[in-house]
A protein has these predicted regions:
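Extended catalytic cores of very large enzyme megasubunits
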Residues: 1-595
Length: 595
Protein backbone atom coordinates (compact mmCIF):
# COMPACT_ATOMS: atom_id res chain seq x y z
CA UNK A 1 0.00 0.00 0.00
CA UNK A 2 1.24 3.49 -0.89
CA UNK A 3 2.16 5.74 2.03
CA UNK A 4 1.97 9.54 2.18
CA UNK A 5 4.63 11.69 3.86
CA UNK A 6 2.97 14.12 6.29
CA UNK A 7 4.24 17.62 7.09
CA UNK A 8 5.88 16.49 10.32
CA UNK A 9 7.88 13.84 8.47
CA UNK A 10 5.81 10.87 9.59
CA UNK A 11 3.96 8.69 7.10
CA UNK A 12 0.42 7.35 6.86
CA UNK A 13 -1.33 4.95 4.52
CA UNK A 14 -2.97 6.63 1.54
CA UNK A 15 -6.72 7.03 2.14
CA UNK A 16 -8.91 7.95 -0.82
CA UNK A 17 -11.76 8.67 1.60
CA UNK A 18 -9.87 11.66 2.99
CA UNK A 19 -9.46 13.03 -0.53
CA UNK A 20 -13.19 12.66 -1.14
CA UNK A 21 -14.10 14.40 2.12
CA UNK A 22 -11.72 17.31 1.38
CA UNK A 23 -13.30 17.79 -2.05
CA UNK A 24 -16.83 17.65 -0.67
CA UNK A 25 -15.95 20.15 2.07
CA UNK A 26 -14.87 22.57 -0.66
CA UNK A 27 -18.08 21.86 -2.59
CA UNK A 28 -20.14 22.59 0.53
CA UNK A 29 -18.85 26.16 0.44
CA UNK A 30 -20.36 26.71 -3.03
CA UNK A 31 -23.91 27.42 -4.13
CA UNK A 32 -24.05 24.20 -6.17
CA UNK A 33 -23.40 21.98 -3.16
CA UNK A 34 -21.75 18.55 -3.15
CA UNK A 35 -21.38 16.09 -6.00
CA UNK A 36 -20.60 12.70 -4.47
CA UNK A 37 -20.08 11.02 -7.82
CA UNK A 38 -17.49 13.56 -8.99
CA UNK A 39 -15.62 13.59 -5.66
CA UNK A 40 -15.42 9.77 -5.74
CA UNK A 41 -14.17 9.81 -9.34
CA UNK A 42 -11.43 12.34 -8.54
CA UNK A 43 -10.39 10.46 -5.40
CA UNK A 44 -10.21 7.21 -7.40
CA UNK A 45 -8.17 8.87 -10.18
CA UNK A 46 -5.72 10.30 -7.65
CA UNK A 47 -5.43 6.90 -5.95
CA UNK A 48 -4.53 5.32 -9.30
CA UNK A 49 -2.01 8.04 -10.12
CA UNK A 50 -0.38 7.80 -6.69
CA UNK A 51 -0.21 4.02 -6.96
CA UNK A 52 1.66 4.29 -10.25
CA UNK A 53 4.17 6.83 -8.94
CA UNK A 54 7.64 5.51 -8.24
CA UNK A 55 8.61 8.33 -5.88
CA UNK A 56 7.38 9.22 -2.41
CA UNK A 57 4.20 11.29 -2.31
CA UNK A 58 3.63 14.00 0.28
CA UNK A 59 0.57 15.94 1.39
CA UNK A 60 1.42 18.92 -0.84
CA UNK A 61 1.53 16.61 -3.88
CA UNK A 62 -1.96 15.34 -3.10
CA UNK A 63 -3.32 18.85 -2.68
CA UNK A 64 -1.81 19.85 -6.03
CA UNK A 65 -3.54 16.88 -7.66
CA UNK A 66 -6.89 17.80 -6.11
CA UNK A 67 -6.57 21.34 -7.47
CA UNK A 68 -5.64 20.06 -10.95
CA UNK A 69 -8.54 17.61 -11.16
CA UNK A 70 -11.07 20.12 -9.88
CA UNK A 71 -9.86 22.79 -12.30
CA UNK A 72 -10.20 20.38 -15.22
CA UNK A 73 -13.75 19.43 -14.14
CA UNK A 74 -16.97 21.42 -14.39
CA UNK A 75 -16.66 22.36 -10.70
CA UNK A 76 -14.22 25.25 -10.96
CA UNK A 77 -16.26 26.90 -8.19
CA UNK A 78 -15.16 24.12 -5.84
CA UNK A 79 -11.57 24.41 -7.11
CA UNK A 80 -11.57 28.09 -6.15
CA UNK A 81 -12.85 27.34 -2.64
CA UNK A 82 -10.29 24.56 -2.21
CA UNK A 83 -7.41 26.80 -3.33
CA UNK A 84 -8.50 29.61 -0.98
CA UNK A 85 -8.89 27.19 1.94
CA UNK A 86 -5.44 25.71 1.29
CA UNK A 87 -3.82 29.13 1.01
CA UNK A 88 -5.40 30.45 4.22
CA UNK A 89 -4.49 27.29 6.15
CA UNK A 90 -0.88 27.58 4.96
CA UNK A 91 -0.72 31.17 6.22
CA UNK A 92 -1.91 30.25 9.71
CA UNK A 93 -0.11 26.92 10.10
CA UNK A 94 2.79 28.28 12.17
CA UNK A 95 0.44 30.11 14.52
CA UNK A 96 -1.66 26.98 15.00
CA UNK A 97 1.45 24.94 15.76
CA UNK A 98 2.51 27.44 18.42
CA UNK A 99 -0.76 27.07 20.28
CA UNK A 100 -0.94 23.29 19.97
CA UNK A 101 -0.17 22.67 23.62
CA UNK A 102 -3.76 21.68 24.29
CA UNK A 103 -5.26 18.41 25.45
CA UNK A 104 -6.42 17.56 21.94
CA UNK A 105 -3.26 17.49 19.87
CA UNK A 106 -3.29 17.98 16.10
CA UNK A 107 -2.21 14.37 15.64
CA UNK A 108 -5.32 13.17 17.51
CA UNK A 109 -7.76 15.54 15.82
CA UNK A 110 -6.35 14.70 12.37
CA UNK A 111 -8.17 11.38 12.62
CA UNK A 112 -11.49 13.27 12.61
CA UNK A 113 -10.62 16.13 10.28
CA UNK A 114 -11.10 14.01 7.16
CA UNK A 115 -14.10 12.04 8.35
CA UNK A 116 -17.43 12.76 6.65
CA UNK A 117 -19.70 14.98 8.73
CA UNK A 118 -21.96 12.83 10.93
CA UNK A 119 -24.84 15.26 10.34
CA UNK A 120 -27.62 15.03 7.78
CA UNK A 121 -28.65 18.06 5.71
CA UNK A 122 -30.96 19.49 8.38
CA UNK A 123 -28.35 18.98 11.08
CA UNK A 124 -25.71 20.68 8.95
CA UNK A 125 -28.01 23.63 8.32
CA UNK A 126 -28.71 24.09 12.03
CA UNK A 127 -25.03 23.71 12.86
CA UNK A 128 -23.78 26.30 10.34
CA UNK A 129 -26.59 28.71 11.22
CA UNK A 130 -26.18 28.47 14.99
CA UNK A 131 -22.79 27.20 16.15
CA UNK A 132 -20.15 27.52 13.42
CA UNK A 133 -18.05 30.59 14.13
CA UNK A 134 -16.39 32.74 11.49
CA UNK A 135 -12.63 32.14 11.15
CA UNK A 136 -11.42 35.59 9.99
CA UNK A 137 -7.81 34.62 9.32
CA UNK A 138 -9.00 31.97 6.86
CA UNK A 139 -12.12 33.79 5.61
CA UNK A 140 -14.48 30.89 6.27
CA UNK A 141 -16.69 29.28 8.88
CA UNK A 142 -15.61 26.49 11.20
CA UNK A 143 -16.14 22.85 10.33
CA UNK A 144 -17.77 20.55 12.87
CA UNK A 145 -14.49 18.94 13.93
CA UNK A 146 -13.16 22.41 14.77
CA UNK A 147 -16.23 23.52 16.72
CA UNK A 148 -16.20 20.28 18.71
CA UNK A 149 -12.50 20.76 19.45
CA UNK A 150 -12.91 24.37 20.55
CA UNK A 151 -15.81 23.54 22.89
CA UNK A 152 -14.30 20.37 24.37
CA UNK A 153 -10.89 21.98 24.92
CA UNK A 154 -12.55 24.91 26.65
CA UNK A 155 -14.59 22.67 28.93
CA UNK A 156 -11.61 20.49 29.79
CA UNK A 157 -9.35 23.49 30.43
CA UNK A 158 -11.48 24.91 33.25
CA UNK A 159 -9.91 22.48 35.73
CA UNK A 160 -7.05 20.04 35.08
CA UNK A 161 -8.44 17.19 32.97
CA UNK A 162 -6.67 14.13 31.64
CA UNK A 163 -5.86 13.82 27.95
CA UNK A 164 -7.74 10.50 27.88
CA UNK A 165 -10.95 12.03 29.23
CA UNK A 166 -10.77 14.97 26.83
CA UNK A 167 -10.22 12.63 23.88
CA UNK A 168 -13.13 10.35 24.82
CA UNK A 169 -15.42 13.34 25.28
CA UNK A 170 -14.32 14.67 21.89
CA UNK A 171 -15.00 11.31 20.19
CA UNK A 172 -18.51 11.22 21.56
CA UNK A 173 -19.22 14.85 20.72
CA UNK A 174 -17.89 14.54 17.17
CA UNK A 175 -19.99 11.41 16.59
CA UNK A 176 -23.10 13.18 18.00
CA UNK A 177 -23.33 10.75 20.90
CA UNK A 178 -23.25 13.47 23.52
CA UNK A 179 -23.14 17.24 23.71
CA UNK A 180 -22.00 20.14 25.82
CA UNK A 181 -24.42 23.05 26.07
CA UNK A 182 -25.37 24.85 22.88
CA UNK A 183 -24.09 28.05 24.46
CA UNK A 184 -20.64 26.48 24.94
CA UNK A 185 -20.60 25.25 21.35
CA UNK A 186 -21.08 28.89 20.31
CA UNK A 187 -18.80 30.77 22.72
CA UNK A 188 -16.57 28.13 24.33
CA UNK A 189 -12.86 28.89 23.92
CA UNK A 190 -13.47 32.45 22.72
CA UNK A 191 -12.78 35.73 24.52
CA UNK A 192 -16.49 35.81 25.35
CA UNK A 193 -16.25 32.64 27.43
CA UNK A 194 -13.39 34.12 29.42
CA UNK A 195 -14.81 37.60 29.99
CA UNK A 196 -18.51 36.65 30.20
CA UNK A 197 -18.70 33.20 31.86
CA UNK A 198 -22.47 33.51 32.29
CA UNK A 199 -22.78 33.37 28.50
CA UNK A 200 -22.19 29.60 28.80
CA UNK A 201 -25.47 29.03 30.61
CA UNK A 202 -28.66 28.00 28.85
CA UNK A 203 -30.83 28.42 31.93
CA UNK A 204 -31.40 31.10 34.55
CA UNK A 205 -34.16 32.32 36.84
CA UNK A 206 -34.95 35.60 38.60
CA UNK A 207 -37.69 36.57 41.06
CA UNK A 208 -38.77 40.14 40.27
CA UNK A 209 -38.99 41.66 43.75
CA UNK A 210 -36.74 44.68 43.13
CA UNK A 211 -35.79 46.81 40.15
CA UNK A 212 -32.28 45.40 39.93
CA UNK A 213 -33.93 42.18 38.76
CA UNK A 214 -34.60 43.85 35.40
CA UNK A 215 -30.92 44.77 35.13
CA UNK A 216 -29.96 41.13 35.57
CA UNK A 217 -32.63 39.91 33.14
CA UNK A 218 -31.34 42.35 30.52
CA UNK A 219 -27.73 41.28 31.03
CA UNK A 220 -28.49 37.55 30.90
CA UNK A 221 -30.52 37.91 27.72
CA UNK A 222 -27.73 39.99 26.19
CA UNK A 223 -25.18 37.24 26.81
CA UNK A 224 -27.52 34.58 25.43
CA UNK A 225 -29.03 32.85 28.45
CA UNK A 226 -32.69 31.91 28.61
CA UNK A 227 -34.37 33.57 31.59
CA UNK A 228 -37.25 32.51 33.79
CA UNK A 229 -39.03 35.40 35.55
CA UNK A 230 -41.50 35.25 38.45
CA UNK A 231 -43.89 38.17 38.98
CA UNK A 232 -46.25 37.01 41.73
CA UNK A 233 -48.24 39.67 43.54
CA UNK A 234 -46.26 38.98 46.72
CA UNK A 235 -43.00 39.47 44.78
CA UNK A 236 -43.95 42.72 43.10
CA UNK A 237 -45.37 44.15 46.35
CA UNK A 238 -41.81 44.36 47.71
CA UNK A 239 -40.79 46.87 45.03
CA UNK A 240 -40.76 50.62 45.73
CA UNK A 241 -43.28 52.91 44.12
CA UNK A 242 -42.35 54.69 40.89
CA UNK A 243 -42.85 58.28 39.81
CA UNK A 244 -44.63 58.49 36.48
CA UNK A 245 -44.71 62.25 35.89
CA UNK A 246 -41.18 62.72 34.53
CA UNK A 247 -40.95 63.86 30.91
CA UNK A 248 -38.81 61.55 28.75
CA UNK A 249 -37.01 63.15 25.78
CA UNK A 250 -35.15 61.18 23.09
CA UNK A 251 -32.38 63.24 21.48
CA UNK A 252 -31.89 62.94 17.72
CA UNK A 253 -29.31 60.29 16.84
CA UNK A 254 -25.98 61.50 15.48
CA UNK A 255 -23.62 58.49 15.40
CA UNK A 256 -20.23 59.02 17.00
CA UNK A 257 -17.00 58.04 15.27
CA UNK A 258 -15.85 54.59 16.36
CA UNK A 259 -12.63 55.98 17.84
CA UNK A 260 -14.60 58.38 20.06
CA UNK A 261 -17.26 55.99 21.38
CA UNK A 262 -17.46 55.19 25.09
CA UNK A 263 -18.39 51.71 26.33
CA UNK A 264 -19.84 52.89 29.64
CA UNK A 265 -23.03 54.88 30.06
CA UNK A 266 -22.97 58.24 31.83
CA UNK A 267 -25.55 60.01 34.00
CA UNK A 268 -25.38 63.81 33.80
CA UNK A 269 -27.41 66.39 35.72
CA UNK A 270 -28.31 70.00 34.94
CA UNK A 271 -30.51 72.74 36.42
CA UNK A 272 -31.29 70.53 39.42
CA UNK A 273 -34.31 68.91 37.76
CA UNK A 274 -32.92 67.35 34.55
CA UNK A 275 -31.00 64.11 34.08
CA UNK A 276 -29.32 63.06 30.84
CA UNK A 277 -28.37 59.43 30.16
CA UNK A 278 -25.60 58.99 27.58
CA UNK A 279 -25.89 55.35 26.53
CA UNK A 280 -22.60 53.51 26.12
CA UNK A 281 -21.69 51.21 23.24
CA UNK A 282 -21.50 47.84 25.01
CA UNK A 283 -23.66 45.26 26.73
CA UNK A 284 -22.62 46.67 30.07
CA UNK A 285 -23.37 50.18 28.84
CA UNK A 286 -26.88 49.24 27.73
CA UNK A 287 -27.63 47.49 31.02
CA UNK A 288 -26.23 50.44 32.97
CA UNK A 289 -28.40 52.87 30.99
CA UNK A 290 -31.56 50.93 31.79
CA UNK A 291 -30.57 50.78 35.46
CA UNK A 292 -30.15 54.59 35.47
CA UNK A 293 -33.51 55.01 33.73
CA UNK A 294 -35.41 52.89 36.24
CA UNK A 295 -33.60 54.38 39.25
CA UNK A 296 -34.53 57.89 38.13
CA UNK A 297 -38.16 56.78 38.37
CA UNK A 298 -38.16 54.91 41.70
CA UNK A 299 -35.30 56.23 43.86
CA UNK A 300 -36.15 59.01 46.31
CA UNK A 301 -32.63 60.30 45.67
CA UNK A 302 -33.91 61.59 42.31
CA UNK A 303 -37.38 62.75 43.38
CA UNK A 304 -36.72 66.28 42.08
CA UNK A 305 -35.87 65.08 38.55
CA UNK A 306 -38.78 65.86 36.23
CA UNK A 307 -37.01 65.59 32.85
CA UNK A 308 -35.04 62.58 31.59
CA UNK A 309 -33.05 62.97 28.36
CA UNK A 310 -31.74 59.93 26.48
CA UNK A 311 -28.73 60.30 24.17
CA UNK A 312 -27.90 57.45 21.75
CA UNK A 313 -24.90 58.91 19.87
CA UNK A 314 -22.39 56.44 21.37
CA UNK A 315 -24.37 53.42 20.11
CA UNK A 316 -22.88 51.91 16.96
CA UNK A 317 -24.91 52.11 13.77
CA UNK A 318 -27.22 49.33 12.65
CA UNK A 319 -25.44 46.60 10.69
CA UNK A 320 -21.94 47.09 12.10
CA UNK A 321 -20.22 43.79 12.84
CA UNK A 322 -20.02 42.72 16.47
CA UNK A 323 -16.46 41.50 16.88
CA UNK A 324 -16.75 39.77 20.25
CA UNK A 325 -20.12 38.01 20.22
CA UNK A 326 -20.57 37.78 16.48
CA UNK A 327 -23.44 39.00 14.32
CA UNK A 328 -24.34 42.59 13.55
CA UNK A 329 -25.42 45.58 15.63
CA UNK A 330 -29.10 46.41 15.92
CA UNK A 331 -28.48 50.14 16.06
CA UNK A 332 -30.00 52.67 18.42
CA UNK A 333 -33.63 52.27 17.41
CA UNK A 334 -34.23 49.08 19.39
CA UNK A 335 -32.93 50.78 22.55
CA UNK A 336 -35.09 53.81 21.86
CA UNK A 337 -38.15 51.58 21.42
CA UNK A 338 -37.37 49.82 24.69
CA UNK A 339 -37.23 53.04 26.71
CA UNK A 340 -40.33 54.41 24.98
CA UNK A 341 -42.31 51.26 25.72
CA UNK A 342 -41.20 51.12 29.36
CA UNK A 343 -42.31 54.76 29.69
CA UNK A 344 -45.71 53.76 28.30
CA UNK A 345 -45.97 50.97 30.89
CA UNK A 346 -45.32 53.47 33.68
CA UNK A 347 -47.88 55.92 32.29
CA UNK A 348 -50.44 53.13 31.97
CA UNK A 349 -49.87 52.24 35.63
CA UNK A 350 -50.45 55.90 36.53
CA UNK A 351 -53.75 56.00 34.62
CA UNK A 352 -54.86 52.77 36.27
CA UNK A 353 -54.18 54.18 39.76
CA UNK A 354 -55.11 57.78 38.98
CA UNK A 355 -51.88 58.89 40.66
CA UNK A 356 -48.35 60.00 39.74
CA UNK A 357 -46.63 57.88 42.40
CA UNK A 358 -47.69 54.25 41.98
CA UNK A 359 -46.77 50.67 42.69
CA UNK A 360 -46.35 48.47 39.64
CA UNK A 361 -48.64 45.49 39.10
CA UNK A 362 -47.43 42.04 37.98
CA UNK A 363 -48.67 42.72 34.44
CA UNK A 364 -46.41 45.81 34.34
CA UNK A 365 -43.39 43.75 35.37
CA UNK A 366 -44.31 41.10 32.80
CA UNK A 367 -44.42 43.83 30.16
CA UNK A 368 -41.05 45.30 31.17
CA UNK A 369 -39.37 41.87 31.09
CA UNK A 370 -40.87 41.22 27.65
CA UNK A 371 -39.92 44.68 26.35
CA UNK A 372 -36.32 44.03 27.40
CA UNK A 373 -36.47 40.70 25.57
CA UNK A 374 -37.88 42.35 22.46
CA UNK A 375 -34.96 44.78 22.40
CA UNK A 376 -32.41 41.98 22.76
CA UNK A 377 -33.89 39.80 20.02
CA UNK A 378 -33.54 42.56 17.43
CA UNK A 379 -29.77 42.59 17.32
CA UNK A 380 -27.15 40.35 15.75
CA UNK A 381 -27.45 36.62 16.33
CA UNK A 382 -29.07 36.97 19.76
CA UNK A 383 -32.37 35.34 20.58
CA UNK A 384 -34.65 35.81 23.57
CA UNK A 385 -36.07 32.89 25.55
CA UNK A 386 -38.30 33.85 28.49
CA UNK A 387 -40.91 32.25 30.70
CA UNK A 388 -43.00 34.35 33.09
CA UNK A 389 -44.57 32.74 36.16
CA UNK A 390 -47.75 34.39 37.42
CA UNK A 391 -50.29 33.97 40.22
CA UNK A 392 -53.27 31.66 39.90
CA UNK A 393 -55.68 34.59 40.37
CA UNK A 394 -53.78 37.19 38.30
CA UNK A 395 -56.17 37.36 35.34
CA UNK A 396 -54.41 40.37 33.78
CA UNK A 397 -51.17 38.41 33.43
CA UNK A 398 -52.86 35.11 32.56
CA UNK A 399 -54.73 36.80 29.70
CA UNK A 400 -51.78 38.98 28.65
CA UNK A 401 -51.79 37.52 25.13
CA UNK A 402 -55.55 37.17 24.68
CA UNK A 403 -55.74 40.34 22.59
CA UNK A 404 -52.34 40.06 20.95
CA UNK A 405 -53.92 40.05 17.49
CA UNK A 406 -56.37 42.57 16.11
CA UNK A 407 -58.03 43.15 12.74
CA UNK A 408 -56.47 45.70 10.42
CA UNK A 409 -58.42 48.04 8.18
CA UNK A 410 -58.30 45.45 5.39
CA UNK A 411 -59.77 42.80 7.72
CA UNK A 412 -56.51 40.91 8.25
CA UNK A 413 -55.39 39.69 11.65
CA UNK A 414 -52.17 41.45 12.67
CA UNK A 415 -50.13 41.72 15.86
CA UNK A 416 -51.01 44.76 17.96
CA UNK A 417 -47.70 46.71 17.96
CA UNK A 418 -48.39 48.16 21.42
CA UNK A 419 -48.24 44.71 23.04
CA UNK A 420 -46.21 42.80 20.42
CA UNK A 421 -43.48 42.38 23.03
CA UNK A 422 -45.71 39.92 24.89
CA UNK A 423 -44.78 37.33 22.27
CA UNK A 424 -41.35 37.09 23.91
CA UNK A 425 -42.37 34.80 26.78
CA UNK A 426 -44.27 31.64 27.46
CA UNK A 427 -46.49 32.33 30.46
CA UNK A 428 -47.36 29.81 33.17
CA UNK A 429 -49.43 29.82 36.34
CA UNK A 430 -47.33 29.19 39.44
CA UNK A 431 -49.61 27.00 41.55
CA UNK A 432 -48.56 27.27 45.19
CA UNK A 433 -51.00 24.51 46.14
CA UNK A 434 -52.73 21.72 44.28
CA UNK A 435 -55.34 23.17 41.89
CA UNK A 436 -58.96 22.04 42.20
CA UNK A 437 -60.78 20.10 39.49
CA UNK A 438 -62.62 23.31 38.58
CA UNK A 439 -59.30 25.17 38.31
CA UNK A 440 -57.91 22.53 35.96
CA UNK A 441 -61.07 22.49 33.85
CA UNK A 442 -60.78 26.27 33.37
CA UNK A 443 -57.04 25.93 32.74
CA UNK A 444 -57.41 23.32 30.00
CA UNK A 445 -60.16 25.36 28.38
CA UNK A 446 -57.75 28.30 28.12
CA UNK A 447 -55.01 26.08 26.70
CA UNK A 448 -57.31 24.85 23.92
CA UNK A 449 -57.21 28.29 22.32
CA UNK A 450 -53.51 29.17 22.43
CA UNK A 451 -51.60 26.50 24.34
CA UNK A 452 -51.22 28.89 27.27
CA UNK A 453 -50.98 29.32 30.13
CA UNK A 454 -48.84 26.39 31.17
CA UNK A 455 -48.40 25.60 34.81
CA UNK A 456 -45.70 25.03 37.40
CA UNK A 457 -46.49 23.08 40.59
CA UNK A 458 -44.58 24.51 43.55
CA UNK A 459 -45.54 21.61 45.84
CA UNK A 460 -44.08 19.04 43.43
CA UNK A 461 -40.95 21.13 42.84
CA UNK A 462 -40.32 21.59 46.56
CA UNK A 463 -40.23 17.80 47.05
CA UNK A 464 -37.09 17.66 44.92
CA UNK A 465 -35.66 20.99 46.03
CA UNK A 466 -36.72 22.72 49.27
CA UNK A 467 -35.68 26.20 48.08
CA UNK A 468 -37.39 25.80 44.71
CA UNK A 469 -38.72 29.14 43.49
CA UNK A 470 -39.00 28.89 39.72
CA UNK A 471 -37.79 27.42 36.45
CA UNK A 472 -35.88 28.20 33.28
CA UNK A 473 -37.82 28.88 30.02
CA UNK A 474 -37.93 25.16 29.15
CA UNK A 475 -39.06 24.35 32.72
CA UNK A 476 -36.84 21.28 33.12
CA UNK A 477 -34.54 22.83 35.75
CA UNK A 478 -35.68 23.65 39.31
CA UNK A 479 -34.06 26.94 40.30
CA UNK A 480 -33.77 29.41 43.13
CA UNK A 481 -33.70 33.11 42.32
CA UNK A 482 -30.39 34.09 40.69
CA UNK A 483 -29.76 30.44 39.87
CA UNK A 484 -28.14 29.10 36.70
CA UNK A 485 -27.79 25.72 35.05
CA UNK A 486 -25.63 24.49 32.18
CA UNK A 487 -27.12 21.58 30.22
CA UNK A 488 -25.14 18.60 29.00
CA UNK A 489 -26.85 15.96 26.89
CA UNK A 490 -26.38 12.30 25.99
CA UNK A 491 -27.94 11.11 22.72
CA UNK A 492 -28.96 7.60 23.77
CA UNK A 493 -29.80 6.67 20.17
CA UNK A 494 -26.10 7.10 19.40
CA UNK A 495 -25.44 3.99 21.49
CA UNK A 496 -27.96 1.75 19.70
CA UNK A 497 -25.67 -0.38 17.56
CA UNK A 498 -26.69 -0.29 13.92
CA UNK A 499 -28.48 -3.34 12.61
CA UNK A 500 -28.05 -5.82 15.45
CA UNK A 501 -30.67 -4.45 17.87
CA UNK A 502 -28.23 -4.16 20.77
CA UNK A 503 -27.52 -1.27 23.11
CA UNK A 504 -23.94 -0.31 23.95
CA UNK A 505 -24.82 -0.07 27.64
CA UNK A 506 -21.23 0.31 28.79
CA UNK A 507 -20.55 3.17 26.36
CA UNK A 508 -23.85 4.86 27.29
CA UNK A 509 -23.14 4.80 31.02
CA UNK A 510 -19.60 6.07 30.45
CA UNK A 511 -20.99 8.94 28.36
CA UNK A 512 -23.37 9.79 31.21
CA UNK A 513 -20.44 9.93 33.61
CA UNK A 514 -18.54 12.18 31.19
CA UNK A 515 -21.65 14.36 30.93
CA UNK A 516 -21.77 14.85 34.70
CA UNK A 517 -18.05 15.64 34.89
CA UNK A 518 -18.30 18.15 32.03
CA UNK A 519 -21.26 19.80 33.76
CA UNK A 520 -19.44 20.09 37.08
CA UNK A 521 -16.45 21.73 35.38
CA UNK A 522 -18.82 24.40 34.10
CA UNK A 523 -19.70 25.39 37.68
CA UNK A 524 -16.09 26.33 38.43
CA UNK A 525 -15.52 29.70 36.64
CA UNK A 526 -16.18 32.77 38.78
CA UNK A 527 -19.27 34.51 37.42
CA UNK A 528 -19.26 38.20 36.64
CA UNK A 529 -22.26 39.11 38.86
CA UNK A 530 -21.38 38.43 42.53
CA UNK A 531 -24.91 37.55 43.72
CA UNK A 532 -25.31 34.99 40.95
CA UNK A 533 -21.84 33.61 41.60
CA UNK A 534 -22.73 33.06 45.28
CA UNK A 535 -25.80 31.00 44.36
CA UNK A 536 -23.79 29.09 41.76
CA UNK A 537 -21.05 28.16 44.24
CA UNK A 538 -23.68 27.14 46.78
CA UNK A 539 -25.77 24.92 44.47
CA UNK A 540 -23.48 23.87 41.56
CA UNK A 541 -26.48 22.61 39.59
CA UNK A 542 -25.85 20.10 36.81
CA UNK A 543 -28.24 19.55 33.93
CA UNK A 544 -27.49 16.01 32.72
CA UNK A 545 -30.19 15.33 30.16
CA UNK A 546 -31.06 12.61 27.64
CA UNK A 547 -32.31 12.83 24.08
CA UNK A 548 -33.26 10.25 21.44
CA UNK A 549 -34.87 8.02 24.05
CA UNK A 550 -37.87 6.74 22.09
CA UNK A 551 -35.78 6.22 18.96
CA UNK A 552 -33.43 4.07 21.02
CA UNK A 553 -36.30 2.14 22.62
CA UNK A 554 -37.74 1.36 19.20
CA UNK A 555 -34.33 0.40 17.80
CA UNK A 556 -33.39 -2.07 20.54
CA UNK A 557 -36.86 -3.10 21.70
CA UNK A 558 -36.74 -2.25 25.41
CA UNK A 559 -39.74 -3.17 27.54
CA UNK A 560 -41.21 -0.69 30.02
CA UNK A 561 -39.49 -2.41 32.94
CA UNK A 562 -36.17 -2.42 31.06
CA UNK A 563 -36.55 1.30 30.37
CA UNK A 564 -37.16 2.02 34.05
CA UNK A 565 -34.11 -0.01 35.02
CA UNK A 566 -31.89 1.74 32.47
CA UNK A 567 -33.09 5.19 33.57
CA UNK A 568 -32.26 4.31 37.17
CA UNK A 569 -28.78 3.20 36.09
CA UNK A 570 -28.23 6.41 34.15
CA UNK A 571 -29.38 8.59 37.06
CA UNK A 572 -27.11 6.68 39.44
CA UNK A 573 -24.14 6.93 37.04
CA UNK A 574 -24.51 10.72 36.75
CA UNK A 575 -25.04 11.25 40.48
CA UNK A 576 -22.12 9.05 41.52
CA UNK A 577 -19.79 10.63 38.95
CA UNK A 578 -20.77 14.15 40.07
CA UNK A 579 -20.24 13.42 43.77
CA UNK A 580 -16.95 11.61 43.17
CA UNK A 581 -15.64 14.43 40.95
CA UNK A 582 -16.73 17.10 43.45
CA UNK A 583 -14.77 15.35 46.19
CA UNK A 584 -11.79 15.03 43.85
CA UNK A 585 -11.86 18.78 43.13
CA UNK A 586 -12.64 19.79 46.72
CA UNK A 587 -16.02 21.32 45.78
CA UNK A 588 -19.46 21.17 47.35
CA UNK A 589 -21.58 18.39 45.86
CA UNK A 590 -24.17 19.49 43.28
CA UNK A 591 -27.63 20.07 44.72
CA UNK A 592 -29.24 18.54 41.61
CA UNK A 593 -27.61 16.48 38.86
CA UNK A 594 -30.22 15.37 36.33
CA UNK A 595 -33.06 17.19 34.58
Amino acid sequence: MKHVIKRDGSSAAFDAGKIRVAIENAMLETTKGTDGKLSAEIASAIETQVGMSEREVNVEDLQDLVEDYLMSSERKDAAKKYIIYRYERDKTRDARKRRDGNLLADAFVAGFKHKPSPMNQLGSFVYYRTYSRWVPEEARREYWWETARRAVEYNCSIVPTSKEEAEQLYRNVFDLKQFLSGRTFWIGGTEVSRHYPMANYNCSFQVVDNFSAFRDVFYLLMVGSGVGVRVLKSDVAKMPKVRTDAEVIHEAYTPMLRSLRQDSSALEFSRGDTARIVIGDSKEGWVQAMEYFLKLHYSTEYRKINTIILNYDQVRSKGERLQTFGGTASGHQSMKNMFAKISNVLRKAARRSAADHVRLAPIDCLDIANIIGENVVVGGVRRTAEIVLVDQDDRDSILAKSELYKKSEDEKWVVDPEIAHRQMSNNSIYYRKKPTREDLHWHFTQMRYSGEPGWVNEEAGAKRRPNFNGVNPCAEILLDSKGLCNLTTVNVMGFARGGDGRLDRKGLLEAQRLSARAGLRMTCPELEIPEWNAVQQRDRLLGCSLTGWQDMVNAVGLSRDEQIELLKELRAAATEAAREYARELGLTEPLLVTT
